[in-house]
Amino acid sequence: MRKLSSYIGRYWYGYVFAVASMVTAIALDMLYPKITQKIVDDVILGGQMEILTKLLTGIVLVGIGRSIFGYCKEFTFDFLSSKIGAEMRKDLFNHLQTLSMRYFDDTNTGELMARVKDDVDKIQNALGYVGMLLIEVTIHVVFVLYCMFSLNWKMAFLPVTVMLCCAVVAIIMERKLDKVYEDISEENAVLTTVAEENLAGVRTVKAFAREDYEIKKFLSHNERYYNLNITQSKVLVRYYPLFQFVGKVLPVAITILGGISVMNGNMSLGALVAYVEYSRNCTWPMEMMGWLTNDLSSAVASYKKIKKIYEVKPEIEDSRNVVTLDHVSGNVEFDHVSFKLDGKQILSDISFSVKEGKTLGIMGATGSGKSSIINMLHRFYDTTEGSVRLDGVDIRKISLRQLRRSVAVVLQDVFLFSDTIEENIKMGNRSTMQMDEIKSAAASAQASSFIEKMDEQYETVIGERGVGLSGGQKQRISIARALSKHSPILVMDDSTSALDMETEHEIQKTLNSLKDTTKIIIAHRISAVCHADEIIYLQDGRIAERGTHEELLAKKGLYYDTYMAQYGGYLAS
């Protein structure tokens, strides 16, 4: 992760301008007590009425200048923090895109949403308004103390001592808040995850009448989040009143001490008035200390959470010596492939090859490792043993971009984006795809019939995760998306399970017409794979049977049992 200093360094000129504007505005602020001193000593007590107009004009000009430079300061800080926040969000999102599937298997979506949105917002706030105030408080205090020392250096030791004490208290407060904010950030991510999962699966929740259970689960996390915020509040209310008390008492103490100096002839009345004004300028930084410490502690906790994400390195990366294939024919070979995940053996000694334009069918019981073959081919995971080759080249040597562009896939768990049907179909070939190609892909996937009955047709906006469409309709749009990619390899993972037999037959005819496309079809239905050039049947991560449809039936093994389970009743009748 780039350090915050590197983000700030990119816009150093902006921060220089903002700080210069701030210094100018603060310097102008320091003139008010000086002018007040002149009015008291020279006009009221000295009777020099002729300079009153000049002094009043000075107040107006100082006010105008203060407003202009104050605007420049605040606008620049806001602009720069928004810019840096956007860049941090972009960099974090880009980093997430590089991470391997294993990371997303182990990390909740709600947690990542909290990091990308809430935590970056807190850092952005720290670099903007909070950061501006922190710098302003520091510069303001330096200017005020300089002016106070120039008026009466003995009395200036009082505010210096008070400020040092407040700084120590602020450090103690920050240390107490640090762990609390880390816990709050963590629980916020959990709460977001619970809410996101519940709302995404609201139909399932209602179908199983699980509303009460989900409410209790949410409330338990909500209560913990509430308790953590109460813990935070207890720390704040313990220290906030101290800062406010000191801020109110200091001007009074200065007035008393200054009054004694005036009576002893060591200070003019105007100087005392100016000194009290300067002391009031000391109070708001002290009152702000608690608030600034609170927000900075929150931002630091958020930064630590984001930093942890950047510490995660992608397990799947391009090799140093990438091989670029001039033309991908689509020859796929698994050579003694084995795969373990979290110590569990998923695939064992899998070997097969599919030539260009040929079709491989893969069957097996749930959990037999069928979908893991897709994960290997896409390099979502790397093999534990053996190798996967594309056109004779180990896919670990091919760039991930070229590899994944060469494979179109229809996943078992169909995911459609909250966008138009058109955008969902042309996702795989977005930059060059024309409308007639989209319609052709939809027709090939038997999707055009229901799409064109919709009021907006291809401009129809699909609800979140395809809400509003049936399972079969979602599968057909997903198939159209894969076909529109025109990749040399097409993988279908149980992608016709929600289709009626007639629609499945039409799609099968489309697949058969793709003579130059290598097809790997994973299915539970015999009808989806019976036309394949070769069929492999997996059991417990191993190839138990292989052959053509007719050869496997003749063996009367697992494939035959599946066939009889699906068609036995029909054959008997």
Per-segment meaning from a language model:
Residues 1-29, 36, 44-56, 65, ...:
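Membrane-integrated ABC transporters
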